[in-house]
């Protein structure tokens, strides 16, 4: 028998070719030059810019209240044009556009009346809210637009700024995007224990919906530079900012929760007073809840290993057992003092469970949690919290090795 091809092959091939010819491809695609790519947003208390005042005088106005000012950081496609080889661009890579009104959605669309490239949020990285605005309105109100608008990524990071939020999106350096810089700095947890784990929009919304108190990384600015310094305390019942933790208090929170990937603890030599630095290589935190006489209590056991990162003492016995034990004890004393200070602040001053210890009660004592959850922050404020800390020096850098 000869090899006969099935009769259905030829018609099928014709159909497939016809479908390929009719395929529209990326019918909804838009050229990148036609997009106003927003990489960051800052939201402040409403204050009209000089440009807006001038436009309104010419009749460019509509019905609104000046409740908030929204600033978008938009990529400028020609921002580096005209630069020589190895030289930075003659223009900034970005442009900050500010508009004032009472609806974030309306303000976003308002920009399309003055720019050929409307706002496009698929590459959005950060949202920064000023402390004044966060004290006035709840985060649920301020973030509602970003969660509903499909163009904005739920993974974009949320920050609070002490002072004007728009200033965090400005830099002296014209070769860098300020919004990108904020995400880069917030990724430096492996180098510094005074940073919070990044807070994406979706996680913040989860805490807000659960009426949980939580922390947001705080930003400060000066002379065209920005620094991540401490944390903003968001109160669960209201969703508003009620205060701040300083850098060392934030570090203490990370010790308790175990959210430390790296960092240092500086102490002083017992006899000489010289600087000794313990570099953190690992931290483990175990939190256990218990109920005694109808009251909740927590036992927190923290273990850390590290290396001797720096020592200024001229003594020759730095690696003897008794001196290593002293280094460990001095470093532990510093951490314990910071934890005690932080606990007093969050329990007695703010009465806000930013440590999220309520999760342990919910898991291990579900019946009690049902009873307590509405007033949990107040119950947390009166809870007994015991911390047990152990630090061990395991490495000594390249200057010496431990002798057995």
Placement of each model-derived feature along the sequence:
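Membrane-proximal alpha-helical signals and transmembrane carboxylates
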Residues: 2-404
């Amino acid at each position: 028998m000869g090899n006969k091809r099935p009769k259905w092959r030829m018609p099928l091939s014709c159909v497939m070719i016809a479908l390929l010819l009719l395929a529209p491809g990326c019918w909804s695609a838009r050229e990148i030059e036609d997009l106003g790519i927003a990489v960051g947003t800052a939201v402040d208390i409403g204050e009209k810019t000089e440009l807006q005042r001038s436009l309104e005088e010419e009749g460019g106005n509509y019905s609104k209240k000046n409740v908030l000012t929204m600033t978008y950081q938009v990529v400028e496609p020609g921002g580096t044009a005209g630069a020589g080889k190895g030289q930075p661009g003659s223009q900034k890579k970005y442009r900050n556009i500010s508009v004032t009104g009472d609806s974030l959605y309306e303000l976003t669309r308002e920009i399309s009346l003055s720019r050929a490239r409307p706002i496009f949020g698929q590459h959005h990285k950060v949202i920064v809210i000023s402390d004044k605005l966060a004290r006035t309105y709840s985060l649920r109100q301020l973030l509602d637009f970003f969660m509903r608008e499909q163009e904005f990524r739920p993974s974009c990071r949320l920050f609070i700024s002490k002072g004007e939020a728009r200033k965090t999106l400005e830099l002296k350096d014209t070769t860098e995007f300020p919004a990108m810089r904020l995400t880069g700095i917030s990724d430096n947890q492996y180098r510094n224990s005074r940073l919070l784990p990044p807070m994406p929009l979706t996680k913040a919304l989860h805490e807000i919906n659960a009426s949980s108190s939580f922390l947001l990384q705080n930003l400060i600015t000066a002379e065209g530079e920005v620094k991540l310094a401490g944390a903003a305390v968001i109160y669960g019942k209201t969703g508003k900012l009620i205060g701040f933790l300083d850098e060392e208090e934030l570090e203490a929170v990370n010790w308790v929760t175990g959210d430390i990937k790296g960092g240092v603890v500086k102490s002083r030599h017992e006899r000489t007073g010289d600087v000794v630095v313990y570099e953190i290589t690992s931290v483990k935190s175990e939190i256990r809840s218990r109920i005694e006489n109808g009251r909740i209590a927590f036992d927190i056991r923290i273990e850390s290993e590290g290396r001797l990162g720096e020592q200024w003492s001229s003594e020759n016995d730095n690696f003897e057992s008794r001196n290593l034990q002293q280094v460990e004890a001095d470093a532990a004393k510093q951490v314990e003092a910071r934890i005690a200070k932080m606990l007093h602040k969050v329990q007695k001053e703010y009465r806000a469970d930013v440590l999220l210890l309520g999760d342990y009660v919910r898991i291990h004592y579900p019946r009690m949690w049902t009873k307590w959850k509405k007033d949990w922050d107040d119950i947390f404020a009166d809870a007994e919290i015991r911390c047990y800390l152990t630090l061990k020096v395991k490495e000594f850098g390249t200057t010496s090795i431990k002798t057995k």
